[in-house]
Amino acid sequence: MGRVRLLTEGDVTQLLPMSLALETVESVFRWQAAGQTVNKPRVRLRAPKGFLQVMPAVVPEVGAMGLKAYTVVAGRVRFVVPLFSTETGELIGILEADRLGQVRTGAASGVATKYLARPDADVVGCYGTGYQAETQLEAICAVRRIRRIQVYGRDPE
């Protein structure tokens, strides 16, 4: 087996700017629409003190297959993505994936905004101030000239 790369949360943050995430998510959406990917629904398994959830996928265009797995234990969620070569089946990388999921989710909203929002849209509303809000807004601002952001949350701050 070749060298396996481990990317930490810090590595992912450094290596995955929103511009790259937008480009990649748009490409994968195109491949998915063309039937060139395999993406299965989430599998949820109950554990004595929490849950394990797994989402497998294959993307031949990039030579990778893998899964996103995450645990929910004591109110804490942790994500990891092991990736394998579609050519050899070898493990090629393991990514800590909290930030990856956050950026990917934001990028999906950015791609949707690019194609579905009016070209002159310059105001965005964001419901919620939690984990996903920052990258949702970052991605939308990357594809539209946003002049005003209205954020709605349960807490005044």
Which functions belong to the PLM regions below?
Residues 143-157:
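NAD(P)-binding Rossmann-fold cofactor-contacting core
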Residues 17, 132, 151-155:
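Short, contiguous, pocket-lining structural segments
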